[in-house]
């Protein structure tokens, strides 16, 4: 079985809550709600990173980009992928081993790596600018 769903997210931090709600609704519809906690944490971190790092501080919160951040959820063959598209071409970088994990910020990709089975990113090409950062979750057998 394969399925996909996506939503546009406004360039405001309130979008993180909307992304979690969208994820909850989608996973429930796909009958894989038992993975919600891990997936929601990862989605929250990916969306927060997109909003914090991909949009410059001087970007108006109602920026005309349509949309500046987009969440995609894709399910197929025992896998779930959460992908967040943003307008920045900058490479996402996880905190290096030995860095201060007690700091208030900077742990997002470490959490993504810890709670997903794998993660990565790729630049967008063509008319789309920016990148997609994704996380993969292996699912138990589901119809």
Task: Walk through the language-model features, giving the residues of each.
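Bergerat-fold GHKL ATPase/HATPase_c domain
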Residues: 1-41
